């Protein structure tokens, strides 16, 4: 048994998490609503605040949702790189890219 546990430490962690979350949900309805509202707040408000909440996917979501212009610029974006002497995009590029996207 000990060898099995050391070989698969993740399964033990997953089982623990599954055990801990349903218990308060089924025992106390108050805990359920609190947990749900808490999860919703974390998911919609700022997933970056809780590091356990899959920061990679959360970052992707906010990154693609917020700047529509930015997602277009990297294709032409040699000017956008901080290494460039200008540092910022030329006004022409920004004006052409953003309104056509929106």
Curated annotation (Swiss-Prot):
Bias type Polar residues, positions: 1-10, 72-82
Superkingdom: Eukaryota
Region (Disordered): 1-30, 70-102
Stated name of the protein: Putative uncharacterized protein encoded by RBM12B-AS1
């Amino acid at each position: 048994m000990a060898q099995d546990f050391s070989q698969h430490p993740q399964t033990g962690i997953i089982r623990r998490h599954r055990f801990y979350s349903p218990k308060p949900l089924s025992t106390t309805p108050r805990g359920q609503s609190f947990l749900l509202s808490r999860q919703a707040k974390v998911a919609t408000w700022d997933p970056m605040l809780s590091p356990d909440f899959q920061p990679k996917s959360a970052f992707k979501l906010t990154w693609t949702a917020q700047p529509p212009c930015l997602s277009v610029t990297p294709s032409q974006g040699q000017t956008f790189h901080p290494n460039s002497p200008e540092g910022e995009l030329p006004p022409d590029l920004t004006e052409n890219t953003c309104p056509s996207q929106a």
